[in-house]
Amino acid sequence: MNKTLNQKAWFFVIPVFVLVAFNAVVPLMTVVNYSFQETFGSNVFAWEGTRWFKEILHSERFHASLGRQFIFTFIILLIQLPLGIGIALTMPKKGWGVPVCLILMSMPLLIPWNVVGAMWNIFALPEIGFLGNTLNSIGFDYNFTQQSGDAWFTTILMDVWHWTSLVVLLSYAGLNSIQPAYYQAAEIDGASRWDIFRYIEIPKMKKVLTLAILLRFMDSFMIYTEPFVLTGGGPGNATNFLSLDLVKMALGQFDLGPAAAMSLIYFLIVLLVCWIFYSIMMKDEGRV
């Protein structure tokens, strides 16, 4: 009976595997193929070996865009994690305020990425945008279309507005999963609010926070649509992150070989960082 059920289950699962293979494995193998060859159009290829990988790894352009990507991701995590946890701590755990807060927190996540970029482009315009006009009216010389610092500030602010809600919702779920008995024991022992947060809430939220960090790292490190619509990578190359530079190389310059090599390096960096972080967190959890 069990074997029959397992066979029926596999019958329904196989189409999913085929779909995943078609949408993931086949494009990946195509990129690998292009990364070792030079294309001359009309399906004419010449073998190049590891030439494109060496060229990318020694390219100052690649180093600069990769550096900007890491800096952006670090700043985003540094802001969104504490902010998201702080907001989650202030949210009610029961009553009519719960659904209201959850709906408000979910709304930014439901807006498409290109719409977010367009919204913030209009919102931050120095002359007619609310943010730009307000900053200039109080004495700041703000213009994200011409000044690199303002472009970075606007891009970071946009991402914080768009994605902090994800950290809030995950943190809120982690807080609600903590048994009331822990809080009761802490109250009996006379623990302060800081002690409860440090010794009860943070340890109990470790898995949820690990997930939040991994998701936000991957999202922020591979960000493309929002900064493309907002700044286009400018002014100059100020916000030309690795994701934008990759698209410019592949579609703008049509350098498919170097672009394929860069995309594989990009992919491996994301996998490596996620694996290292996850291994450290799981090792630390095993000690506990």
Give the positions of each predicted feature.
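A structural signal for multi-pass alpha-helical bundles of membrane permease subunits
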Residues: N2-V288
